[in-house]
């Protein structure tokens, strides 16, 4: 309640049990759409069925919302197996869909251990933007000094933060 009052937010958070049921007309305008579509369809630990797995098609729900709402930026995340799935055809289809929507895409693989997180977890990140003037200003991203988030923030800031030296 306090956060809503401070930031003049009049709407409650909304939770959708199924991304396919989201009506874009029910959403306010926004500048950034973040999505981590299910990775099981592309992961080495999964069966790697790709778009043949219903979970693998949820990227297209993100694309549907992006087409309807036209946010300036998209930030997408998945496992590195997405890059090589079906000999790169799956990733090419995703890039093509984003291009068809008018988004310029930069992507990279980052490992959480380079950003002060006490685990090694590689993920591919796609940063997509409508304005071509953003090109070259976003990536590459590097972990600067290996400090943990708790060391940078100087405390947990009201949330559980994991420190490489233990739970804070």
Which residues fall in each region the model found?
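SAM cofactor-binding core of SAM-dependent methyltransferases
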Residues: 1-20
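Class I S-adenosyl-L-methionine
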Residues: 22-30, 40-168
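Active-site-proximal cofactor/substrate-binding loop regions of enzyme domains
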Residues: 15-17, 35-36, 62
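Solvent-exposed polar/charged
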Residues: 5, 35, 67-68
